[in-house]
């Protein structure tokens, strides 16, 4: 257990992959290309999430190897920044994970391939966020690959779909995760006065939202309506990010020099 019941409540939502937590931290706190996070500050942040220093070192090694971050050393202190590649990856998903509103409505299409088309070719021709009700049927949005020019394509009335479509668009387990996240965020107490604790709360909450949201595309929002659990979690995380605003790095560095309580 940590010193904060609210932190414990968020940690109970699921195990943390340390390398992914570091990506969340770097992406949320290092907004400018020149921004860096020193090792002692990063250690304080992850210790507040129950992550030990050995696990952090392994995660940093992996992220450097995979091109996410780079390190500089000043005396005995290392600092870390996103590489241009890491920043590009972060910026690519920023409109999705920070959006406070659902995506703009666009038509959803049911696509059936021509009989002569191989199933794998059909799958390969569709966008990554396509959902497959069956091996030779697809739900997708946007323009189609020319390879599908002979496919049967029909635009769906998303207000008149059968109930079973929900379990095709997103798994029941993911829906339950979103419900638990929204409930946990809505039960958080007043923002604590300690900047380090506030920041750790922000980062854990945002990390859980980020890992859930990046597992799927826009189809759940387009098909399941405005009150599905993911939409409720999005509203809750937007409110949480306002309650626990992003700190200035200099203020956070100063807070990190205060011994942990």
Protein language model features and the residues they cover:
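Short alpha-helical segments that sit at the start of domains
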Residues: 2-25, 88
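Short acidic, hydrophobic short linear motifs in intrinsically disordered regions
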Residues: 33-45
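Short, hydrophobic-biased segments on the C-terminal half of alpha helices
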Residues: 57-61
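Glycine-centered, phosphate/nucleic-acid-interacting loop/turn motifs that mediate DNA/RNA or nucleotide
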Residues: 67
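Short, Lys/Arg-rich nucleic-acid/phosphate-binding segment
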Residues: 73-79
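Short, amphipathic alpha-helical interaction segments positioned at domain boundaries
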Residues: 87-109
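Mid-protein regulatory/catalytic core that forms ligand/cofactor-binding pockets
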Residues: 116-197
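C-terminal regulatory/effector modules of DNA-binding transcriptional regulators
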Residues: 170-261
